[in-house]
């Protein structure tokens, strides 16, 4: 699934209009807490040029899924977050089903409490294995171990 959010002067209705649209800002403006000063200065330059544009721009959401394209301009922030959440859940479910079909993973874990239980059991096994190996290393380096 590919999701593209664009700022455009008018809503796009189909793919041909999207190809013909020339005045679109494709930058999502997703910044992390540690971005470099060059990017920050280029962002300031682009935003200063946008100040002269009218503020009538609408948010366009374009979704490519299963070979289909859907373009929408009437989404709220909450609806966009819901779509992204559903998409990430779908991707996670598909990756889990692929791993379980390979036989390399245990069956799908249904909820967080069961997942926590599996993580706790895994941590116990790992700690037990570590302690056994450590005791064997200590015994192997002990001067009295050779004479037993």
Swiss-Prot record:
Domain Tify, first and last residues per copy: 54-89
Q: What is this protein called?
A: Protein TIFY 5B
Q: Name one GO biological process term.
A: defense response
Q: Where in the cell is it found?
A: Nucleus
| Entry function | Repressor of jasmonate responses.
The entry's comment on post-translational modification says:
Ubiquitinated. Targeted for degradation by the SCF(COI1) E3 ubiquitin ligase-proteasome pathway during jasmonate signaling.
Q: Name one Pfam family in it.
A: tify
Regulation: induction: Up-regulated by jasmonate, wounding and herbivory.
Species lineage: Eukaryota, Viridiplantae, Streptophyta, Embryophyta, Tracheophyta
The gene for this chain is TIFY 5B
Q: Which cysteines are joined by disulfide bonds?
A: none
Query: Which keywords, in A-to-Z order, does the entry hold?
Result: Jasmonic acid signaling pathway, Nucleus, Plant defense, Transcription, Transcription regulation, Ubl conjugation
User: Has the keyword Ubl conjugation been applied to this entry?
Assistant: yes
Query: Is Disulfide bond among this UniProt entry's keywords?
Result: no
Which InterPro entries does the record associate with it?
TIFY/JAZ (IPR040390), Tify_dom (IPR010399)
Q: What PROSITE patterns would the database entry show? A: TIFY (PS51320)
What domain comment accompanies this record? The jas domain (120-144) is required for interaction with COI1.
Gene Ontology, cellular component aspect:
nucleus
| Family indicated by similarity | Belongs to the TIFY/JAZ family.
């Amino acid at each position: 699934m590919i999701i593209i959010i664009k700022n455009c002067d008018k809503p796009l209705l189909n793919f041909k209009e999207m190809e013909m649209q020339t005045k679109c800002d494709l930058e999502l403006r997703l910044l992390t807490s540690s971005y470099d000063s060059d990017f920050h200065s280029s962002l300031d330059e682009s935003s200063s040029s946008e100040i002269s544009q009218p503020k009538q721009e609408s948010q366009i959401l374009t979704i490519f899924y299963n070979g289909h394209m859907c373009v929408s301009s009437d989404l709220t922030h909450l609806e966009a977050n819901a779509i992204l959440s559903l998409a990430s859940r779908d991707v996670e479910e598909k990756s889990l089903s692929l791993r379980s079909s390979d036989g390399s993973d245990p069956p799908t874990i249904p909820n967080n409490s069961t997942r926590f239980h599996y993580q706790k059991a895994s941590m116990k096994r790992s700690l037990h294995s570590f302690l056994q190996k450590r005791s064997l290393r200590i015994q192997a380096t002990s001067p009295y171990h050779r004479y037993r």
